[in-house]
Amino acid sequence: MSNAITMGIFWHLIGAASAACFYAPFKQVKQWSWETMWSIGGIVSWLILPWTISALLLPDFWAYYSSFNLSTLLPVFLFGAMWGIGNINYGLTMRYLGMSMGIGIAIGITLIVGTLMTPIINGNFDVLINTEGGRMTLLGVLVALIGVGIVTRAGQLKERKMGITAEEFNLKKGLLLAVMCGIFSAGMSFAMNAAKPMHEAAAALGVDPLYVALPSYVVIMGGGALINLGFCFVRLAKVKNLSIKADFSLAKSMIITNILLSALGGLMWYLQFFFYAWGHARIPPQYDYISWMLHMSFYVLCGGIVGLVLKEWKNAGRRPVSVLSLGCVVIIIAANIVGMGMAS
């Protein structure tokens, strides 16, 4: 396996670790509605950071974006909005199916859809079937899916042992939302694929290869921001027990602390895709669809490890932890299989 591929896998791991940890600061926010907290974090992660970093990278910010016609920018924006819809459905999936089953189904679907639909859309699916490297990467995707399933099973065992149930369990509604969430969340993968002309234009301007995807985030995350912030603002305006005024009527020190914690959560959320861009840049172009599989499977892996470190599994018993450990090992094996496939 070449150093470039190894580093690509490593950066995807770092990005996924940030994704697995980003909600920790949000959990420390006190006496604020979820909508206010999520909006502050979202403004940082979807608007401030993409625009600021792009302004630092590009020699002429406005000239870069104005060089693209609507037929290039619109699909990128709409796929970003598609991801935003999946993101909103994610929380509802947890409500109706519970954390483990909801995550397992949603992540499993988005892993498959986001990974395999890209080469199909590009007319390159034959590379998966007719080449040794393609078949090996396809095997890696399958093994990763098995790993996600094992981790999901561990979570179910943990919830059963600790008496944790879904907030409003509804299998039919939950499964429908999980499928929608999985499909729509793959919009981020499709957006990265649609943004290739933007990456190439950034490279032509002399932007370092590690950073060429970052300017496209202004458009991708702009689409996601429209959906997420729109959802939050509508709820803040219409739901009687939610109020921005009430959230900002707390003691000044608490308001500042909540803003800083929400901003930190937003920063950590953004860093997952900052390092995703680094990892994506190191993956061979013919296998760039594998970036999504690496990100999502590592997200599950890191989520399990973070849970162990934070002692969330302390009272779960030995069996759930053993099953979780097995799932993590399977995901690591999947990453190695994919790496060898890309190197062959």
From Swiss-Prot:
Q: Which GO terms describe its molecular function?
A: rhamnose transmembrane transporter activity; symporter activity
Location (main, coarse): membrane
Its annotated compartments are: Cell inner membrane
Q: Which domain of life is it from?
A: Bacteria
Topological category with respect to the lipid bilayer? Multi-pass membrane protein
InterPro entries in the record? L-rhamnose-proton_sym_RhaT
The role this protein plays is: Uptake of L-rhamnose across the cytoplasmic membrane with the concomitant transport of protons into the cell (symport system).
Name of the protein in its database record: L-rhamnose-proton symporter
- Tell me the organism: Citrobacter koseri (strain ATCC BAA-895 / CDC 4225-83 / SGSC4696)
Q: Which gene encodes it?
A: rhaT
